[in-house]
Regions:
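Catalytic core of pol beta-like nucleotidyltransferases
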Residues: 1-33, 42-43, 47, 60-115
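Residue-level recognition of strand-loop junctions within catalytic nucleotide-signaling folds
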Residues: 56-58
């Protein structure tokens, strides 16, 4: 069981360090790569800011219908929110590519910092 982070004033660097420390636990959720973007990556987060993460799943771990991916996604979200004690928004590369405003998707791709 992971220990919940009780500090609410984490920096982007601390979030990345925590993600690196939990790499083995993240493998349980089929995470291939995880990165931070948004206000925490830029260093302009507020006390109520959520944590924005870009997650690339190991798609080879799922069958051709991606059975179980939704459950893994939701479980990962709960795990991370528990870990950080904050709301976590997770995007995948596919969801970033589907953002209609290309400037937004390009900014996410440019600003992501991988753990």
């Amino acid at each position: 069981m992971s220990k919940k982070i009780t500090r609410r004033d984490l920096t982007g660097k601390e979030i990345l360090d925590i993600l690196r420390e939990h790499k083995d636990a993240l493998k349980k959720y089929k995470v291939r790569k995880i990165g931070l973007f948004g206000s925490y990556a830029k260093g302009d987060q507020k006390r109520k800011s959520d944590i924005d993460l870009l997650v690339e799943f190991d798609m080879a771990a799922f069958d051709e219908n991606f059975r179980g991916l939704f459950d893994i996604f939701m479980d990962l979200s709960s795990y991370l929110e528990n870990l950080f004690g904050k709301k976590v928004d997770i995007l995948t590369p596919v969801s970033v590519d589907s953002i209609r405003i290309k400037e937004v998707s390009e900014e996410i791709k440019r600003s992501v910092i991988y753990a």
